[in-house]
C-alpha cells in the first residue's frame, strides 16, 4: 500500500472514530456572554444572554436554537428579533428530571444548527444540561462531559447534577418524546418554596436530636440539602413583582439574611460544630416563619 493510499485510509477511518473535545482551550470568554464553554462542535453553554447584543452575537455565529434550563421566562422577544428560537426546559439544582433529559435529546436530534444552552449564571445547571446534550448527540464521552462541567465551575456540592450526568443513558427508540415549548409557565417563588418545604421536611427529622447528632450522622446528605436551600432562596428572590414596591427592600433583605444564615450553617458543619449548626437551622426556621407571617399569612 503506497503512502498516499495509506494516508487516505487513515483519514477516512479517523473521521468515523469519536473525536474528543479539545481540552487545550480551557475557557472561552465572549464579550456578550459569560461562561462560554464548548461541549463539542455546535454545542455551547453559558449564562443568560443579557440583551440585544448577546442575541445578535449568537445569530451571527450561526446559532438558531437556544435552550434555557433556568426557571425565569426566556426573553423571547429579543430572540425572535434575531431569528432565534427558544426551548424552555426548567430544571432544579438537585438533578436532571427525566423529562428534561428527553427534551435535551429531542433538541439535539432535531437541530441542524449550533445550539446554545444557558441557565442563570452559567456555572451549574447549564453545563449539566449541555453535558447531557453532548452525550445525547455523541459529541462527548461521559468523561469528557464531566471535564467540561469542571471547567465551567459546576460545584461538587450539587451532587445531584453530577449523578445525573454519570448515570445518563440514551432513551430507547420507542420512548415518547416531550413537546418542546418556548416558554413554560411557572413561578420561581412558588417552585422554590415547594422545593424548600420538601428539603426541610427531611432536615427536620435529622434536627430532632438536641446535640446535632442527626446532622453529624448524615453529614454529606445534610450539607447537600443546605446547598439546595441556599439556591432556593436565591431563585425565590429573583421573582419580580411579588411584593409592593414599598416592601421590596425588606423582602430582599430577608432573603439575604436567610442566605447568610445557610452559609453559617454550612461553615459550622465544615468545622464539625454540630450543635452550632443545629442552632443555626432553628434560627433559619424562625426567620422563615416571620417572613411567612408578614408576606404569606396576612
PLM region descriptions:
Residues 5-22:
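Bacterial Sec-dependent signal peptides at the C-terminal "C-region" and cleavage site
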Residues 16-21, 105, 109-113, 135-211, ...:
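PTP/DSP superfamily signal
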Residues 17-35:
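N-terminal low-complexity, Pro/Thr/Ser-rich intrinsically disordered segments
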Residues 41-113, 137:
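Cysteine-based protein phosphatase catalytic domain of the PTP/DSP
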Residues 43-44, 63-64, 68, 90-94, ...:
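Second-shell loop/turn segments in exported
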Residues 47, 59-62, 70, 108-112, ...:
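Sec/Tat-exported extracytoplasmic proteins
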Residues 114-131:
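A phosphate-binding catalytic loop at a beta-strand-loop-alpha-helix junction
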Residues 143, 147, 151, 182-298:
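Sequence context surrounding c-type heme c attachment/ligation sites in exported
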